Amino acid sequence: MYGKFQQHLQEELKAIEEAGLYKKERNIASAQSAEITLQDGSKALNFCANNYLGLADSPRLAAAAKKAIDARGYGMSSVRFICGTQDIHKELEKAIADYFHTDDAILYAACFDANGGVFEPLLTAEDAIISDSLNHASIIDGVRLCKAQRFRYANADMADLEAKLQEAQACRFRIIVTDGVFSMDGNVAPMDKICDLAEKYDALVMVDESHSAGVVGPTGHGVAEQFGCYGRIDIFTGTLGKAFGGAVGGFTTGRQEIIDMLRQRSRPYLFSNSIPPMIAGAGIEMFKMLKESNELHDRLQANVEYFRDRMMAAGFDIKPTQSAICAVMLYDAPLSQKFAAKMAEEGIFVTGFYYPVVPKGQARIRVQLSAAHRKEHLDKAIAAFIKVGKELGVI
């Protein structure tokens, strides 16, 4: 049987490669940071990590992780409800709830699991999910696992959202679901307007803060802080794998009864091992760091403004951004790959994104800024973009 299936896969893979859509991995042989060493020994500046606050190689977090291993061991060998809950898991959940001004929080192995496990326990075929068209794949998959009726509105389009809410008025419960920051374009969801519509049409609100927590808002606390929406958002999901240290682990935080129900019925929570003690210990320390100072957030914002302004002045087509994501639009998939390859030759580590990660004809280089970037890093990257952009006729 595998012979026929193997041939089918080989043909599919060949077609992907011929279309210029084949994704290849580049191996890093150093800690994740602004400056990295690749497996071939070459050095590069990294502008494609989710390391927004530059904490991925934080000595303080590494020390906290080591301390947790020494005190609580390497792993849990259990799910939470059997014997996989330690005191530090509960302490981290409390820190997350405090950060987002919510009642309680629940930990997952990843935010993909948090989004995949949030809808099915809470909603039935009598209910409606109204989801932004550019929401993350994990939200899309989570919605698919649920029997609720599905409505999709155009990205951040409040008129279309209102129309979909009107369509869903006959449903028992309605929930509006959005990313806080949309990962490919870098735009921020207008949470105040979303909450206004939710109140007008009696709907719940859920936001995925994966790319916004630690980044947007006056002190980096995400879209609820930026738009003054504390108390108006029912469910937050997020990750420890981006601004919050860059490791693994996801979470859902929100109203008490919602979190209680997820503990009882969310399948990724019930049937997956607990996050290891070292992740919990480092996560607790990370939230302590963010309470102490806004320095990392402020440095990140200064880097974003500096890079964006100079790239636009150079003539690049840049998506409007209010986050740490800067999308340099190229539109052509093979061009995005070629551009990324030439940037690597200049010592700049970026990735071309193209279909199916973004819609066809919307290929781009997604630049992600970090608090770890210094001015000389930014200047070198901008100079490389200008050089390669001129070579390839982009500017």
Give a label for each model feature:
Residues 9-74, 203:
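N-terminal "arm"/small-domain region of PLP-dependent enzymes with the aminotransferase-like
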Residues 51, 151, 155-207:
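Active-site phosphate-binding strand-loop segment of PLP-dependent enzymes
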Residues 59, 63-67, 71, 94, ...:
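PLP-dependent enzyme catalytic core of the Aspartate aminotransferase-like
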Residues 79-85, 94-117:
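Short loop-beta-helix segment that forms the pyridoxal 5′-phosphate
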Residues 118-137:
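Conserved PLP-anchoring active-site segment centered on the Schiff-base-forming lysine
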Residues 219, 225-261:
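Active-site PLP attachment segment
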Residues 244-311, 316-319:
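PLP-dependent aminotransferase class I/II
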Residues 298-307, 312-347, 357, 361-362, ...:
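Conserved PLP-binding catalytic core of the aspartate aminotransferase-like
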